[in-house]
From Swiss-Prot:
Reported function: Binds to DNA and alters its conformation. May be involved in regulation of gene expression, nucleoid organization and DNA protection.
Annotated Gene Ontology cellular component terms: bacterial nucleoid; cytosol
Organism: Corynebacterium kroppenstedtii (strain DSM 44385 / JCM 11950 / CIP 105744 / CCUG 35717)
Name this polypeptide is given: Nucleoid-associated protein ckrop_0143
Principal location: cytoplasm
Amino acid sequence: MAEPDFNEIMAQAQQMQEELQRVQGEIAQSEISGSAGNGLVKVTMKGTGEVTNVTIDKSVVDPDDVDTLQDLVLGALQDANTALQSYAQEKMGPFSQALG
C-alpha cells in the first residue's frame, strides 16, 4: 500500500481550511429569527449573535405587567439563539464528520 503524498495531504488540508472559512463567513452573514408568545415578540440576529431587530406586538405592552413582556423577549432571544446553533451545526456538520 502506497504512503500518502505529503503535498497531497497538505493540499487537502488547505482546501478544507478554505471551505471552513467560507462556511464560517456564510454563518456570520446569515440572519436568524426567533419568536415567543405565538409571534407576539420576534427577534432577529446575525450569525455572529448580534441582535439586529426586536419586534413587539402592542398587545403585550402593559405597564402593569412588565414581567410578561420581559419573559417574552427573553424567550424570543433564546429561540433565536437555539435556531442559530442548529443552523451552525447543520452547516458545520460535514467538517465534524471529516475530522472524526
